């Protein structure tokens, strides 16, 4: 409400926390934070995006920011920091497999790596897709309608992948979209086992996408 440049850095942002179990695994907090007015919630996918989100938070002089970071190790989505801050649009395309696109994959944080793997797997079955990294919903929502259409209005199926509560994504995926995430409390197990339990792994996601096409 005061419009101050306060930056909150939050870690251990999902079921990727693993063995500490559901008492320590946030499943509703991203949706809760995103519902707060005048707050930018960043969930970067790798080191490069973290740098860019940090820059945006520093430049946001009249609005507080949250930067939510994962605990587990993830592969980098990008390996080179360029002059143009790609996160400044809130969402951007990081991968396109083929020209005749059927699927748009939307992801944040640690699940962006998962979305990339899903896209590659789909391509082996001649199902072509693009992957959109969406590190900040609030910034994306402020973009022009033309930009939002370029990001969202391509292909026949929109799929969100995030290890969090899923209902928030429906405004992007629509009534016929597929929202994959966590709508229950977490589990205590190695994080890869938990992702598989909640069917947030490549094979399960690919099968769900194929059923919805």
Feature-to-residue mapping (PLM):
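A glycine-rich helix N-cap at a beta->alpha junction
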Residues: 1-13, 32
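Residue-level "edge-of-site" marker
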Residues: 12, 47, 135
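Short acidic-hydrophobic, aromatic-tinged amphipathic segments that line or gate anion-handling sites
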Residues: 41-44
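Internal gly/pro-rich beta-alpha loop/helix module
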Residues: 19-36, 47-48, 52-59
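Short glycine-/polar-rich loops that comprise or flank the Walker A/P-loop
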Residues: 3-6, 38-39, 156
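Thiamine diphosphate
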Residues: 7, 16-26, 59-213
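Alpha-helix C-terminal capping segments
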Residues: 1-3, 34-36, 172-174
């Amino acid at each position: 409400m005061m419009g101050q440049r306060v930056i909150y850095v939050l870690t251990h942002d999902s079921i990727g926390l693993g063995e500490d179990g559901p008492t320590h695994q946030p499943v509703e907090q991203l949706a809760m934070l995103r519902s707060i007015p005048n707050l930018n919630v960043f969930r970067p996918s790798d080191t490069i995006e973290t740098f860019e989100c940090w820059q945006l938070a520093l430049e946001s002089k009249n609005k507080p920011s949250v930067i939510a970071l994962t605990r587990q190790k993830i592969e980098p989505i990008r390996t080179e920091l360029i002059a143009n801050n790609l996160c400044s649009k809130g969402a951007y395309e990081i991968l396109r497999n083929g020209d005749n696109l059927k699927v748009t994959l939307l992801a944040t944080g640690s699940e962006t790596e998962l979305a990339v793997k899903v896209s590659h797997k789909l391509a082996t079955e001649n199902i072509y897709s693009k992957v959109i990294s969406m590190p900040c919903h609030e910034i994306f929502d402020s973009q022009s309608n033309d930009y939002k259409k370029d990001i969202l209005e391509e292909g026949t199926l929109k799929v969100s992948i995030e290890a969090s509560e899923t209902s928030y994504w429906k405004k992007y995926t629509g009534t016929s979209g597929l929202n994959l995430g966590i709508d229950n409390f977490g589990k205590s197990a190695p994080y890869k086992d938990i992702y598989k339990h909640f069917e947030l792994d490549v094979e399960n996601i690919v099968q769900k996408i194929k059923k919805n096409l």
